[in-house]
Each structure stands twice: as structure tokens, then as C-alpha cells.
Amino acid sequence: MVGKKIIYVHGFMSAGSTHTAQILRDYMPQATVIAPDLPIHPEEAMELLRNLVKTENPDLIIGTSMGGMYTEMLYGVDRICVNPAFQMGSTITESNMMGKQVYQNERQDGEKEVIVTKALVKEYKEMTEQCFAQVTEEEQLKVFGLFGDEDPIVHTFDLFSEHYTQAIHFHGEHRLIEKAIFHYLMPVIRWIDDRQEGRERCTVLISQDTLADGYGKPKSSLHKAYELLLDNYNVYFVSPAPTNNPSVITEQQAWIEETFSAPAWNHAIFTNQPQLLYGDYFISSTEQPDFLGTVLRFGSDEFKTWEEIITYFERLGGQ
């Protein structure tokens, strides 16, 4: 996101000074991250955000929880909604957030606390009724939803999926911690940046037979290699699609999602004819004589383990 502008929309009882915004700045030092303090009243918050979008013309908007709910309605811009609270009124009451509440982060207006009333909850319920009002095919391509698979507070994956196609689970809870930002949010940001720039990365195909050990666990250094490859390449997993045993596809898809989570979303290819695939590199335990790119024979003398694969790609420097 070099030279680009990002708006970060914080969650309920937070502020623009949240550590999440600073982490985004640290990971994208050549981008400008704007993180405003939101008014507690939702109509005022949406007015502020819409005006900010008009004046700043951001390249990307990222919102978490309540901020994810607001972010969905900022149409026309690429957006990522993280654990979006599309049922904000119910979330407040069910999470015991009525009465006096203290802001979790320092606000520029100096406010320290607020009284959450039934009238305010009603305002949020009325605001959430406006969600998804302008969803089009074009908008569906602009919006990603990221949902923590252990989120105890917000459960809106199915609701989001009724309107948008790019719904992704990630390993995490409700709060967006640094680990989740690095492993799951940043890859999605790279996808968006690549699309905006028309950037075509080289493609690395990884065969299923290189992934797991005899106990079905990820092989040593597999995650390390995957993280390295994600920085520079489009990475896809290639698995067989046995005609007489289709359940294998479901099982392998579940293993990939559990092992690699969000970055592997829509990056699994099931085929019985891998030689027909196009890519720049193919990491496979078997010979692929008809593949037009470079084949790295996993388990061979040159590439006995994932550590040798890592060394190979480090020397390439992203080519």
C-alpha cells in the first residue's frame, strides 16, 4: 500500500488512538493510516465517516466490530470488515455493556466515559437496519469479511454471506490482536493492493503430498515456508479430486483451512490433471514432466525438507 491512504474505523468504546491503528502503521510505514475518534451516537459517527471518505478519498477502509458495521455502509471503496457487529443493539445488551462504560483508549475530546442507555441501544438497532442497503455485484468485489473462528461476542458470518461472497474465517477471537493482523489481515490487504495496482505475482503451486507428515500434522518448517512465499508469490494448494471418493475434497479443504487459515481462502485447486495447470513453480513429491514451469521435487536430494525450499526461494528474491 505504498503511498496509499487507509481509514481505520475502531470498535465500540474504543478510539482512534487504539493500538490496532498503530500496528497497521508499523506494518505499512509507507501508507497513511487515518483513525478518527467516532461519536458515540451512530448517526453522528456515520456522518463523520462519510465526510471523511469524501475529503480523504481513501484507497482502503478497515473496520473492526462496530467499526466493521459502519465500514460495510461506506460504499464505493475497497473495505475489510473484521468481526463486524451487524447486530450492534443486541451485542450491547448481551455483552452487559449497558450503563456507565469507560473508553478503552484515550480520545482527543478528553471524554473518559459514557452512559449507555436503552435509547442509545435503539439508535444502534436502527443504524444496523441500514446495513446491506446498496449491495451490488461491484460492491461484492470491494468488500471482504474476516471472522474469528473463536469470537465469543459477534456471530455474523452467515448474515454477511447472505450479501457478500468474500467471507473468510481466521484463527482468532473478537479482538484483533497483532498476530491476527500479521498472519490473516495483511495477506488480504496485499490481495487488494495487487488488484488496485494491476500487479501480477508469480504463482507457486504446492502439491498436497508435500504438506503433512505420517500423523497428518504439518511438516516441519511448512508454516515458515508458507509465510515466506506469501510475501512475494500467489500460493495455491493442489489436491486430487477422486471421482469415486468426493469426501476427500471436503476433508482436504478442511485441513488446508485449519492449517493455513485466511490466506488460503479460495487458494485450493482440486484436479486429477495437475499437468494442465499453469504456474511458475510447482512443489511436488512426484515428477511433473508436463508442467511448463519450474518443478521443485520435494524429498529429493536437493529439496529434502521445507528448509531447502526456503533457501531456494530466498535466493530468488521474489522472482
Whereabouts are the PLM-identified features?
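Gly/Ala-rich beta-loop-alpha elbow adjacent to hydrolase catalytic centers
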Residues: I62-E72
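Short, acidic loop-to-helix structural element flanking the phosphoryl-transfer center
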Residues: D213-F237
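Asp-based phosphoryl-transfer active-site loop
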Residues: E197-G216
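The alpha/beta-hydrolase serine catalytic core
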Residues: D78-I80, P84-I192
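Active-site catalytic motif of lipid deacylating hydrolases and related acyltransferases
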Residues: V2-T55
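Short, hydrophobic beta-strand segments that form beta-sheet elements in well-ordered domains
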Residues: D59-G63, R79-C81, V143-D149, H267-F270, ...
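C-terminal cap/substrate-recognition subdomain and adjoining C-terminal extension
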Residues: P246-Q319
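Charged phosphate-binding loop/patch that engages nucleotide di/tri-phosphates or the phosphate backbone
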Residues: T165-C202, T294-Q319
